[in-house]
Amino acid sequence: MGKIAKYLKESWYWIVTLVIGILMIFIPNIAQILNWSVFNLEKLSEYHLITIVGVAFCIVAILMLVFHFLHLRNYCIIKVDGMKGKKLPNQKSYYPLDIAKQEFDCYSIFIDDEKSKQSIYEAYCEMKGMFKTNNEKCLYDKYLFYGYTYTPFLFMLGQMYSDNRKYYCFHMQQTNQSTKRVRLKRKSKDDNNLIDAYHENNKETLIIRVGTTVTINNMNISQFGETDVLDITSNKTGTEVIDSIDRLNDWCDIIVKKIRNIDFARYSKIILLLATSAEMVFLLGKRLSKNSDPNFYVYHYDVNAKNPYPWALASKMVNDYDKVVYLYKNDRNY
């Protein structure tokens, strides 16, 4: 019953069907008001009226259900599952979108205790090959994304997919007890805006810090030395602040616009530090072009490392091996 209740809560189908059913009850009354000759109300018994309305309602409901499921079959579900020490739970899905899913489980790819430049490169190539192959075979024009893994992989994954296709994102809600997949709401109820600050030091390296899950102050950048910094953060931070489709898309638009307003000609290196949700990282990768935007070095963060940003992937490097920026050969404490 719990799964049925969740489906009814999440799906628009039953609401539309119920509304149509209620309206059809009033068909005889509408016919009488409009003086339609189709219904001879004096000759029709109550039983006949109920039968006509019931049959008509069932036909409409069945047609809508068929259309609903045929429409959903245009979706391809992108499931990213993989980060050391974490794995998405094996949920039995209640949502009909899953009838069209193509899961890409990356959990086995990304687990590597050594984390050398070679192992990161091999993991990236395997992910790239997996998603590229399935994407080329895929005839879907709509995609649904959910999951999490290392930030650089999420960003590069977003760049693999065309921006002219429709994407929908689920959010992985994590509590002390469980991790579950939830649909984003259409609109957010609370006010939470992005604010930005540009710190100019006339340096050749620019760091762009995006913080919605943690505050910017907690993102230590001392290992990079003196740099120019663009900070983009939300008034309220936390894992659940991006709780709606509108907020996800609006914030993505704002972040991309603020990044593109920068005079990139001044900088020889641009570093992206993203402390935000997996779906936001994926969309930023999709929105920031490999052709027209500059080369971004997207860093992985590890709170247990001696240096919190131990490695990165570069977005525009043609050679995949050159994409991997591995900073500390002797640092195995992460």
Predicted regions and their residues:
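C-terminal structured domain segments
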Residues: D263, Y267-H300
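Structural motif
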Residues: V80-G85, F145-Y150, R209-V214, L273-S277, ...
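A short, acidic, amphipathic alpha-helical segment used as a generic capping/interface helix at domain edges
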Residues: E126-N135, L248-S268, M280-L283
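Redox- and metal-dependent alpha/beta enzyme cores, enriched for Fe-S-associated oxidoreductases
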Residues: D190-K257
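N-terminal topogenic membrane-targeting module
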Residues: L41-F153, S162
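Hydrophobic, helix-forming membrane-interacting segments
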Residues: G2-H71
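Hydrophobic, ordered structural segments
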Residues: N135-S178, V281-L284, S289-N291
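Long, charge-dense
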Residues: K166-L194, N235-I242, N295-Y321
